């Protein structure tokens, strides 16, 4: 099963069905509150751990629950107090509040998720750090995300330029079939900036 937390209201069950996703195994939760998400994950992992330990006591071969959590996107999350600050015209304090709750969030959920082998995948916004000697892309949300993540991948995209392998393949297929195939899509570059499990290797793929 997959718990999909949508903080940007960009998903609905109908659109997910069109992509061929089994919505019977998907739980869609739409919220932008980091406190609410923390409570959802904490309560969920506590209940799953209780059930798992009970089953394990009677059956040593009991498997851990198969679940994946996806948050899209972490950069769009805010805090309950942050919403109140916007309403009262004090939004300037919001970033510091969010960074504090972000650190608390990871401290609360990292260990329970690890004990149950539940992966949590986050998408995030990036910004260019102008303070460094060479401007580099950094993830929003403070350092807590960088410290707690096992893998961080920076994605960038580029248009097909007609000289890449994908364009060459489409051109060859056009000639073989005798019809014109318009090149579309983009080339995505995946650059792992942190990984605890393997040597980071930059790669590219076509969408």
What residues fall within each predicted segment?
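Conserved inter-motif catalytic segment of the P-loop NTP-binding fold
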Residues: 2-100, 104
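Phosphate-binding/switch region of NTP-binding enzymes
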Residues: 95-207
């Amino acid at each position: 099963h997959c718990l999909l937390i949508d903080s940007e209201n960009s998903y609905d069950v109908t659109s997910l069905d069109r992509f061929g996703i089994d919505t019977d195994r998907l739980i869609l939760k739409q919220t932008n509150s980091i406190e609410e998400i923390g409570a959802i994950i904490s309560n969920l992992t506590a209940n799953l751990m209780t059930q798992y330990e009970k089953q394990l006591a009677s059956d040593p071969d009991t498997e851990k629950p198969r679940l994946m959590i996806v948050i899209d996107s972490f950069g769009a999350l805010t805090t309950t107090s942050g919403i109140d600050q916007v309403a009262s015209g004090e939004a300037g304090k919001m970033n510091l509040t969010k960074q504090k709750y972000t650190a608390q969030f990871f401290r609360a959920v990292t260990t329970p998720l690890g004990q149950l082998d539940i992966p949590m995948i986050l998408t995030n916004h990036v910004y260019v750090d102008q303070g460094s000697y060479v401007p580099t892309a950094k993830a929003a949300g403070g350092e807590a995300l960088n410290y707690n993540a096992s893998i961080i991948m920076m994605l960038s995209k580029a248009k097909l330029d007609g000289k890449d392998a994908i364009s060459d393949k489409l051109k060859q297929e056009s000639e073989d079939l005798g019809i014109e195939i318009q090149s579309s899509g983009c080339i995505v570059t995946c650059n792992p900036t942190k990984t605890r499990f393997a040597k980071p290797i930059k790669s590219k793929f076509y969408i």
